[in-house]
Amino acid sequence: MRAPGALLARMSRLLLLLLLKVSASSALGVAPASRNETCLGESCAPTVIQRRGRDAWGPGNSARDVLRARAPREEQGAAFLAGPSWDLPAAPGRDPAAGRGAEASAAGPPGPPTRPPGPWRWKGARGQEPSETLGRGNPTALQLFLQISEEEEKGPRGAGISGRSQEQSVKTVPGASDLFYWPRRAGKLQGSHHKPLSKTANGLAGHEGWTIALPGRALAQNGSLGEGIHEPGGPRRGNSTNRRVRLKNPFYPLTQESYGAYAVMCLSVVIFGTGIIGNLAVMCIVCHNYYMRSISNSLLANLAFWDFLIIFFCLPLVIFHELTKKWLLEDFSCKIVPYIEVASLGVTTFTLCALCIDRFRAATNVQMYYEMIENCSSTTAKLAVIWVGALLLALPEVVLRQLSKEDLGFSGRAPAERCIIKISPDLPDTIYVLALTYDSARLWWYFGCYFCLPTLFTITCSLVTARKIRKAEKACTRGNKRQIQLESQMNCTVVALTILYGFCIIPENICNIVTAYMATGVSQQTMDLLNIISQFLLFFKSCVTPVLLFCLCKPFSRAFMECCCCCCEECIQKSSTVTSDDNDNEYTTELELSPFSTIRREMSTFASVGTHC
């Protein structure tokens, strides 16, 4: 029989082994006690285990308490997996899983959740706890338990997500407390924590399709930040491609408005083609024919240049705006198109006045075989005065014009852009005061300078010139009767150009009067109609002016036909078989506006200085 001391020593060793076994099994999350709470083999009573566990782990940190804390954590994780998704609802006829987010954006919270779900919040808080609460030195059993728990959680929901990388993704990204995750599918996350998050232009993007949305920003169905979901009550966001709103198609579908667009397009093509060809022909005739370089023809070529500029530059921009309700060059075209148009009106006004003065001088010198004695410098000086005066008088239009955008009420459509008269308050004081003065006097200045001055002055000068021509015709001899007829013909041409100009400028003045005095009683559609009519009449004037010159002025029509038929042998043979009387009339007609020549000049001399085409 053994001694009692040996029995006590054996019992002490058994208790020590049981204590070590309880500690190891608690660290692994396994309870050693059985259902009847009795000790098996080398185990001890549950009360001893509970007491030893409390002594080993500290108050409230026994193995059973840790197991109790783990159960709600798993329930929270399951609830997070079964939570509602934030995807867009599927469009009709598309994949039903393509978008459940609009439903979530309408029913769900407009902003981010206040805090991530339970497990993530607990991990983030654990990373911020001081190290002394978990023990010092070697890793404690609680740390081992957390590591094993995280490894067990790796599965369909958290495969490849380690506790360390997940903790870093929350701790190292600035403003991590404001970041949240939007699941794309139920049970699938929208983020990856294998690699550090990379910043994109619109937010923080993870890797392998994981994306972190910014506060108040929901992800699209494809998980990209480029296409933002419009949240209720917030502004619409999107990438640069989505910001490019669709332009209006004026030709489809076929409606009453599309028929009007086709009519506008066809009319503009006719005006563009006729105006470009006619004005280029006038400029080429004057530049390539030495005998046509008189002061009057130079003025007409200058007028043709500005008409060409109006048609070539302004007409496409105006038509584009009329069809799409958008200015092609935006603010630049809004300012430069009115400026060129008003400058063209000034050039036309001053050119008509200069032509009237030139015709009056020609009529008073008919009996002396009127010849142009002005040199090139004198002609250049007159053209420079016309240009500088017209450009300076039109300069306030650049200051007054501002681009305004109006919403059409159609989703996805570009807002309508209008070029309105509005003075910017950012201008310097001097320019601002001048702009206000010009704006208050613009109506009467426009009417007086660009309508009354050319029409009244031209009509008055034409009447005086016609009277001089009649007096010269009564006292003339048969030798210069043809010259007098040509002067009368040219005077009628100037009057016809003035009538055409006055007719085309009337709608612009009517539009200005309506805008100044009757703007409240007239609808916007009526104002738009008046504007487009005045624009088209201005282009029509620029298109018809060369046609009128070719019809009423024989030197221009003959030179145009020679330029068109200079390569045709039939036209050359036909021109060589004319009668001597016709040759004399043509010779007199061509010399009517020729520089540095008289009627007595020989045909050979004339032929040597003339160049065709």
UniProtKB/Swiss-Prot annotation:
Glycosylation site residues: N36, N222, N239
Record PTM text? The N-terminus is cleaved by ADAM10 metalloproteinase; mediating limited proteolysis leading to the release of receptor ectodomain by shedding. In addition, cleaved by FURIN between Arg-54 and Asp-55.
GO biological process per UniProt = adenylate cyclase-inhibiting G protein-coupled receptor signaling pathway; cellular response to reactive oxygen species; dendrite development; dopamine biosynthetic process; G protein-coupled receptor signaling pathway; locomotion involved in locomotory behavior; neuropeptide signaling pathway; positive regulation of dopamine metabolic process
Tell me the superkingdom of the source. Eukaryota
Q: Primary place of residence?
A: other
Entry GO CC? cell surface; cytoplasm; dendrite; endoplasmic reticulum; endoplasmic reticulum membrane; plasma membrane; receptor complex; synapse
Chain ranges on the Cytoplasmic side, renumbered to this chain: 287-299, 357-379, 465-493, 553-613
Using the record, list the residue span of the signal peptide; answer none if the entry has no such feature: 1-26
Task: Give residue spans, biased composition: Low complexity.
Answer: 89-108
Write out the function statement from the record: G-protein-coupled receptor that plays a role in several physiological pathways such as resolution of inflammatory pain and oligodendrocyte differentiation. Acts as a receptor for several ligands including prosaposin, osteocalcin or neuroprotectin D1. Ligand binding induces endocytosis, followed by an ERK phosphorylation cascade. Acts as a receptor for osteocalcin (OCN) to regulate oligodendrocyte differentiation and central nervous system myelination.
Protein name stated in the entry: Prosaposin receptor GPR37
Please tell me the species this chain comes from.
Homo sapiens (Human)
